[in-house]
A protein has these predicted regions:
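CBM-like carbohydrate-recognition segments
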Residues: 54-71, 75, 126-131, 333-414
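Long, repeat-rich segments with strong aromatic
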Residues: 235-350, 362-385
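Aromatic-lined, polymer-binding surfaces characteristic
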Residues: 94-96, 111-271, 283-309
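N-terminal domain-start signal
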Residues: 61-67, 73-106
Length: 414
């Protein structure tokens, strides 16, 4: 019943009939579970994307998007950054789906609509004459973070870059180059600088390999064991290995190898560590879709499982994890989080919290735009329905299996 309720309530924007019209209760149970589940994921995508993309495409994002922060006194400062946060983070989560081929007709209609809105959004975000022109490095250090999410989105969806005319492409390059004057601190931020340079590699634009090389070398030094990196020299109990470190590090390496094969041994080693960390993340998902509320930036909600979603999307899950159980685990997380009231305001914008509206959970750097990192869980929508991730029947994930009395193999460190 919860799944049915979510499907009926989530698609509210009148874009694609199949996604916005509730299916008759008498027939919904006859539909293969994977098809129904994909619709649930698409409705979550639609809830996140619709207000951001439509407002930005109309050059009205700064006018329409509220700026919520932990405390009212922080709003003026966070307003300098929040719009690029919203766009960059949303884009990097939905990019594989925008790139995807072989989608069904009704899904393809929504995909085509959002692709066009994203193109117009990129134009406005990078055009200095537009009202929604964003802060790419003119003020503060935060733009480095979200310019990198934006660049990561273009890496994940090359069709977006290819669809831009030459003037807009140059605007994008100019915007991203502004971030080079921002000196990243000695932590995961090094990877933000590296990702932007990796994007330049993919478009055959002059790049600074030193930024890539330094980020990789430092993270090699910060590895703590059993698939976990320090966020800098120190270990922190949070989800930054998933939010940023593992996905960024591997994808930067994959691109860097095309220019210097000396990175290949590190790429292979990083993949082994990434596989292990995906096992850990899957085991953190409780039988009811809950997960430990620990560490900073917890209000990124479902973004805590960026890495697990990315490994599923890249089809690099460990052999011990069937794609179906990962799909079911991630679906349980989505359902649990979206079941809460007050996750969105009356106009469809995200509100601070994990389960509903909980502004005290935020750090001082969190604002409305920050929250759209939650879209990272949606990466597997880039896989076709015929992929094992979507095409196989439901399977319990580790926590659910254990609590049903199943006899699992013992978990081992790397």
């Amino acid at each position: 019943m919860k799944r049915r309720k979510f499907i009926q309530s989530a698609g509210i924007f009148g874009v694609a009939p199949l996604l916005t019209t509730a299916m008759p209760a008498s027939t919904i149970e006859d539909i293969p579970v994977n098809t129904t589940t994909r619709k649930l994921w698409l409705n979550y995508l639609q809830k996140l994307a619709e207000p951001v993309l439509t407002a930005l495409a109309a050059d009205l994002l700064k006018q329409k998007m509220p700026v919520e922060a932990k405390e009212p006194s922080l709003i003026n400062d966070r307003a300098k950054y929040t719009h690029l946060e919203a766009f960059g983070r949303l884009l990097f989560g939905i990019a594989p789906w925008l790139q995807a081929e072989h989608t069904r007709e009704n899904e393809r209609q929504l995909q085509a609509r959002y692709f066009k809105l994203a193109i117009k959004g990129i134009e406005n975000a990078t055009n200095p004459a537009a009202k929604d022109y964003m802060n790419w490095g003119d003020e503060g250090g935060q733009p480095l973070v979200d310019a990198s999410f934006f660049a990561y989105g273009l890496i994940r969806c090359p069709k977006l870059w290819e669809a831009l005319d030459s003037k807009i492409q140059q605007n994008v390059i100019t915007a991203l180059l502004k971030t080079r004057k921002i000196k990243p601190p000695e932590n995961n931020w090094l990877l933000f600088a590296a990702m932007i340079e990796a994007f330049f590699i993919t478009i055959n634009h002059p790049f600074e390999m030193a930024r890539i090389d330094y980020a990789i070398k430092q993270h090699q030094l910060w590895y703590k064991g059993d698939g976990i990196y320090g966020d800098g020299a120190e270990f922190h109990w949070d989800y930054y290995n998933s939010f940023v470190i593992h996905p960024y590090l591997y994808d930067v390496l994959k691109i860097a190898v095309t220019k210097d094969d000396a990175f290949e041994p590190i790429r292979k080693q990083t993949l082994t560590r990434s596989i292990r960390y995906s096992q850990i993340l899957e085991r953190l998902i409780g039988a009811d879709g809950t997960y430990p509320i620990i560490g900073r930036s917890i209000t990124y909600r479902t973004g805590a499982f960026h890495h697990l979603a990315n490994m599923a999307y890249r089809q690099q899950l460990p052999k011990e994890l069937n794609p179906a159980q990962v799909r079911c685990a991630l679906t349980a997380v989505i359902k649990k989080v979206t079941d809460a009231k007050e996750m969105f305001d009356e106009n469809g914008w995200l509100r601070i919290g994990v389960y509903g509206h909980q502004p005290s959970l935020a750090e001082t750097y969190i604002s409305t735009g920050s929250l759209y990192l939650c879209s990272a869980i949606l990466l597997p929508l880039g896989l076709p329905e015929t992929d094992l991730f979507w095409s196989t029947g439901d399977e319990d994930w580790s926590a659910k299996k254990v609590l049903k009395g199943s006899d699992l193999h013992a978990d081992h460190a790397l």
